UniProtKB/Swiss-Prot annotation:
Domain SIS: 36-198
Miscellaneous information on this protein: The reaction produces a racemic mixture of D-glycero-alpha-D-manno-heptose 7-phosphate and D-glycero-beta-D-manno-heptose 7-phosphate.
Gene symbol of the encoding locus: gmhA
Sites where the protein binds substrate: 51-53, 64, 93-94, 119-121, 124, 174
Protein name according to UniProt: Phosphoheptose isomerase
Similarity field: Belongs to the SIS family. GmhA subfamily.
NCBIfam families noted in UniProt: PRK13936.1
Lineage of source species: Bacteria, Pseudomonadati, Pseudomonadota, Gammaproteobacteria, Chromatiales
BP terms from Gene Ontology: carbohydrate metabolic process; D-glycero-D-manno-heptose 7-phosphate biosynthetic process
């Protein structure tokens, strides 16, 4: 397989991953979008966390809400818990890396807020701890996961929402996660500010 064929294969794999996910996760995306819009409409906020590429996704989602997505509208309250290196390193140093998001959630989260927890495996200790901290604060968790959902899926309550990408490949899961994030932004905007499908 030459380089062009490899690139074409990766495109086809990504398209297939999205097609395979559509029917399985579309209802969960709609449910999550409605929950987020309801929370934001009630002057609540969304806290977001993830590791590595999922940390970048957390910041991407936060920026789309704080600034704008595809329509002009006021900024919406969203905080990526992945951006403050002083806080992350002090918590990791003084306590444990598993607590880097949980301690922030206990300080910033309130009942009615939403946690968007992003993990391709669902097995990251700090993401599981974040979900547990959110539950303690009376928050709903929306979990973006993949594979079998991992420990994160096992800790979710009936009020929480899991959007699990049916793939075993990290890159494909991440690609679907990005599309899910854009779907959530679109649903939030249309629910709160109108437009087709709102």
């Amino acid at each position: 397989m030459d380089s062009h064929e490899r690139v074409a294969q990766l495109f086809h794999d990504s398209i297939r991953a999205k097609q395979d996910a559509l029917d399985r996760i579309a209802p969960d995306i709609v449910r999550a979008g409605r929950a987020m819009a309801r929370a934001l409409g009630a002057d609540r906020k969304i806290l977001i966390c993830g590791n590595g590429g999922s940390a970048a996704d957390a910041q991407h989602f936060s920026s789309e809400l704080l600034n704008r997505f595809e329509m002009e509208r006021p900024g919406l309250p969203a905080i990526a818990l992945t951006t403050d290196s002083s806080t992350l390193t002090s918590v990791a140093n003084d306590y444990h890396y598993d607590e880097v998001f949980g301690r922030q959630i206990r300080a910033l989260g309130h009942e009615g807020d939403i946690l968007l927890a992003i993990s391709t495996s669902g097995g990251s200790g700090n993401i599981v701890a974040a979900q547990q901290a959110a539950a303690e604060r009376g928050m709903i968790t929306v979990a973006l996961s993949g594979r079998d959902g991992g420990t994160l899926a096992e800790t979710l309550s009936a009020e929480d929402i899991e959007i699990r990408v049916p793939s075993e490949t990290t890159a494909r899961i991440q690609e679907v996660h990005l599309l899910v994030i854009h779907c959530l932004c679109d649903l939030i905007d249309r629910t709160l500010f109108g437009g087709p499908g709102g």
